[in-house]
C-alpha cells in the first residue's frame, strides 16, 4: 500500500497555536488529522477525520476553487505558478 503523508502548518491565532493538519492514508482511506493547543487547557487536541472517496474529492475541489479565485483576484498568477512548479518537483 502506498505511503502518503503530508503535514501543513497553520498560522497561530489568539486562542490556538501550534496548529497543523496531517493528511495521510490509513487503512486505504484518506485521513485528515487536525492538531492544536489552546489557551483554555494544557492538553494537546486532536481531531481525526477519515474521508470517503467522495468527501476527499469534494475537499480537493473546494480548496482548488478557493485557491484559484484568491490567486486570480489578488493578481498573483505568476507566484502561484512558481509554487506549483515546486510541488511538481
UniProtKB/Swiss-Prot annotation:
Which protein are we looking at?
Inhibitor of toxin/antitoxin system
What organism is this sequence from? Escherichia phage T7 (Bacteriophage T7)
Against InterPro entries, the record matches this protein to: TA_inhibitor
Q: List keywords of the entry alphabetically.
A: Host-virus interaction, Toxin-antitoxin system
Function per UniProt: Plays a role in the inhibition of the host toxin-antitoxin (TA) system. These modules made by the host and composed of a toxic gene and a neutralizing gene play role in stress response and programmed cell death. Gp4.5 interacts with the host protease lon to neutralize the degradation of the antitoxin that would result in the activation of the toxin and the destruction of the bacteria.
* Assembly behavior: Interacts with host lon protease; this interaction prevents the degradation of antitoxin by lon and thus the toxin activation.
Amino acid at each position: 500500500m502506498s505511503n502518503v503523508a503530508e503535514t501543513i502548518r497553520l498560522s497561530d491565532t489568539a486562542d490556538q497555536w501550534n496548529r497543523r493538519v496531517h493528511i495521510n492514508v490509513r487503512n486505504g482511506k484518506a485521513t485528515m488529522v487536525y492538531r492544536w493547543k489552546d489557551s483554555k487547557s494544557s492538553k494537546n487536541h486532536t481531531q481525526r477525520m477519515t474521508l470517503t472517496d467522495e468527501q476527499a474529492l469534494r475537499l480537493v475541489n473546494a480548496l482548488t476553487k478557493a485557491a484559484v479565485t484568491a490567486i486570480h483576484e489578488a493578481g498573483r498568477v505568476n507566484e502561484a505558478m512558481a509554487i506549483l512548479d515546486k510541488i511538481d518537483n
